[in-house]
Amino acid sequence: MTDTARTHHDITSRDQYPRDRDQYSMIGRDRDQYSMMGRDRDQYNMYGRDYSKSRQIAKAVTAVTAGGSLLVLSSLTLVGTVIALTVATPLLVIFSPILVPALITVAMLITGFLSSGGFGIAAITVFSWIYKYATGEHPQGSDKLDSARMKLGSKAQDLKDRAQYYGQQHTGGYGQQHTGGEHDRDRTRGTQHTT
């Protein structure tokens, strides 16, 4: 049985060999194409390297040009500032008794105008809020104002009731004169003091 298996294996392997050989020859042709493509790729890489080198050189030239021009402009600005200070310093020293009070006055005027403008805007905002509240539009925060008004009203009513109660008590509204302390304790307990 092993002999038949070998022969069968040998036969099938022989039958497959020519096909494998065709595949190998195809692979060889592909290898040649790839080697040609590899040469093209090398040429492309060389061209790409040349291109990237020229690009880097262009970037460097641009950077040097821009940096140099900015350096020249900054040095001109520095020279102009030094010349202006040289000319202006004696003038500032001579006119400082006039300029310093003038600058202080101008600063105070500007501050006054800005603050009065701010107060004017605040006043307009407040009057607008009051107008909306008075016309019943319920602006923002009006519910807090209403609750505070209710609390204040209830406290005022409570104080008024206490004043009436103590006023009637001291004037003899309950039929007798009261000295004070005993009746207050009894009132908190819910009983009346009789003497």
From Swiss-Prot:
PROSITE patterns: OLEOSINS (PS00811). InterPro entries: Oleosin. One of its GO terms (cellular component) is monolayer-surrounded lipid storage body. Residues 60-131 are annotated as: Hydrophobic. It is found in: Lipid droplet; Membrane. The chain crosses the membrane at residues 68-88, 90-110, 111-131. One of its GO terms (biological process) is reproductive structure development. It is a multi-pass membrane protein. Residues 169-195 are annotated as: Disordered. Residues 180-189 have a biased composition (Basic and acidic residues). Keywords: Lipid droplet, Membrane, Repeat, Transmembrane, Transmembrane helix. Sequence repeats lie at residues 19-28, 29-38, 39-48. Residues 1-59 are annotated as: Polar. Belongs to the oleosin family. May have a structural role to stabilize the lipid body during desiccation of the seed by preventing coalescence of the oil. Probably interacts with both lipid and phospholipid moieties of lipid bodies. May also provide recognition signals for specific lipase anchorage in lipolysis during seedling growth. This is Oleosin Bn-III. It comes from Brassica napus. The lineage of its organism: Eukaryota, Viridiplantae, Streptophyta, Embryophyta, Tracheophyta.
